[in-house]
Amino acid sequence: MATTATMATSGSARKRLLKEEDMTKVEFETSEEVDVTPTFDTMGLREDLLRGIYAYGFEKPSAIQQRAIKQIIKGRDVIAQSQSGTGKTATFSISVLQCLDIQVRETQALILAPARELAVQIQKGLLTLGDYMNVQCHACIGGTNVGEDIRKLDYGQHVVAGTPGRVFDMIRRRSLRTRAIKMLVLDEADEMLNKGFKEQIYDVYRYLPPATQVVLISATLPHEILEMTNKFMTDPIRILVKRDELTLEGIKQFFVAVEREEWKFDTLCDLYDTLTITQAVIFCNTKRKVDWLTEKMREANFTVSSMHGDMPQKERESIMKEFRSGASRVLISTDVWARGLDVPQVSLIINYDLPNNRELYIHRIGRSGRYGRKGVAINFVKNDDIRILRDIEQYYSTQIDEMPMNVADLI
């Protein structure tokens, strides 16, 4: 909300040790007034939404859902620090759906995300969860036809999920009307700032009604995020995971010493049979490297698919569809894939390049062991990467061992 609020000191926050089976070692540092609601049935949700939640396959709310949904529904501004794989997307999606007046065919909630695929996934999740509610939801993203956006928005959408640039463009054109918006959700806010969306987020915010409720989700809370929460939020509730406790639990992490860049390719070829036991994602730091590696793998007769931010939207969507369905098993990608894209079968991640910043590490690796599934992460480490690897270990209080010969047995 528009008035500035200084965040309460952590002295007033209470540490809670969670007792859920797969969250045993995560400590939440959470505002005093946050209660735990152990079931969806006791959250006071509408019947048609509950049906959608259970039809989706959810049984019991995750730790973040048990704490955040009720607070958001109450209308409180909420800062939730939550890593990938904790059920954060469903947290705000369920809350948004609960707060809609379906009779009113105007945009009532706006969700901003850093990547096009993430916005589309949020939109699809909303439509699935809101299946029995007759909800209208549109993904407003760059790389798609502007005319189609205008047509969909004119038709009337209860919720718009999108990337900041295209959303702001639609607001400026007056196609996206903001007068009925009650809630703004900033998903993966840290990554939106990393991608230089800060100005556009502020631009969008200026067009919203002054009493708009703000929900911010972020894996990390750097200074710029806290500055934003001070500007946008009133007395926010905090639901935070202490940084040192962000869990990489259930994910076995290894490194392979490759000495030089040229040796990585042969190492990957040696591992290919292991990759295809399940589904694997291979991360490179640049689009050029993704294209180069994809071509080189195909020349060596290995089947791989690839994806990065320069590809046309349609192409990226069909690649994701193939990968989700299991038709393709090995995907080479940049970090565009690392944020929030949910493919349950992925249990192996390879960092062909170590990520450029340590926050990205948990986003990449967090893909491979979602909701307590076990996963394996393998990091290719050149001589001059050893320092970065040790830094990641220290930052996350974790251990990354040399890859054993029997790695296939661990997947």
Swiss-Prot record:
Coiled coil region boundaries: none
Chain positions with N6-acetyllysine modification: 124, 198, 296, 321
Cellular location(s): Nucleus; Nucleus speckle; Cytoplasm
Family matches, as InterPro entries: DEAD/DEAH_box_helicase_dom, Helicase_ATP-bd, Helicase_C-like, P-loop_NTPase, RNA-helicase_DEAD-box_CS, RNA_helicase_DEAD_Q_motif
Main location per the UniProt record: nucleus
Residues bearing PTM N-acetylmethionine: 1
Short sequence motif DEAD box: positions: 187-190
Domain of life the protein comes from: Eukaryota
Covalent link location (Glycyl lysine isopeptide (Lys-Gly) (interchain with G-Cter in SUMO2)): 19, 152, 314, 374, 382
Pfam family, one: DEAD
Keywords in alphabetical order: Acetylation, ATP-binding, Cytoplasm, Helicase, Hydrolase, Isopeptide bond, mRNA processing, mRNA splicing, mRNA transport, Nonsense-mediated mRNA decay, Nucleotide-binding, Nucleus, Phosphoprotein, RNA-binding, rRNA processing, Spliceosome, Translation regulation, Transport, Ubl conjugation
GO CC annotation terms, alphabetical: cytoplasm; nuclear speck; nucleus; U2-type catalytic step 1 spliceosome
Signal peptide: none
The family this protein is said to belong to: Belongs to the DEAD box helicase family. eIF4A subfamily.
PANTHER family per the UniProt record, alphabetical: ATP-DEPENDENT RNA HELICASE DBP3
Name of the protein in question: Eukaryotic initiation factor 4A-III
Organism: Macaca fascicularis
Lineage: Eukaryota, Metazoa, Chordata, Craniata, Vertebrata
This protein's encoding gene: EIF4A3
